[in-house]
């Protein structure tokens, strides 16, 4: 059975790329950043499935250049406002995303910031890295206590 042609617009985690290559005929960008519009226009000409990320603007011009075989845009991320959903649906292209994928990650980062910012962790780290730290003192890098707040 012929494997569907999948265009992946930028590098993903190794395990994801490996699995995709097992299941599909994959054309994988080696870039760690969004590909150019010209590269995207060229890539979609023979795609059956497109796997973009938030940095890839999938507008009407991209969808118009796409192969009639393009049936799925599997967005690698939660947001999808970079994809022209209306035009995709008019062309019979299903658009999916990964809702809630970042919910716990966002909560983790929020907790890290709640602890790091008032306690001046970034400033302390920079002082250590630059070699300017002179040692502990009663008033250095005290920051703000968050207990009870």
Which residues does each PLM region occupy?
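An N-terminal-biased, well-structured beta-alpha scaffold segment characteristic
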Residues: 1-96
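Phosphate-binding beta-alpha-beta segment of Rossmann-like dinucleotide-binding domains, i.e.
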Residues: 91, 99-149
């Amino acid at each position: 059975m012929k494997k569907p042609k999948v265009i992946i617009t930028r590098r993903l985690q190794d395990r994801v790329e490996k699995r995709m290559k097992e299941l599909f005929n994959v054309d994988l960008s080696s870039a760690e950043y969004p590909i150019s519009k010209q590269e995207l226009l060229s890539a979609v000409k023979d795609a059956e499935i497109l796997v973009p990320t938030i940095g890839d603007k999938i507008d009407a011009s991209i969808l118009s250049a796409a192969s009639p075989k393009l049936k799925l845009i599997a967005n690698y991320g939660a947001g999808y406002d970079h994809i022209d959903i209306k035009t995709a649906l008019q062309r019979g292209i299903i658009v999916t995303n990964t809702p809630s994928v970042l919910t716990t990650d966002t909560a983790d980062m929020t907790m890290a910031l709640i602890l790091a910012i008032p306690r001046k962790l970034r400033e302390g780290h920079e002082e250590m890295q630059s070699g300017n730290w002179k040692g502990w003192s009663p008033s250095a890098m005290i920051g703000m206590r968050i207990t009870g707040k």
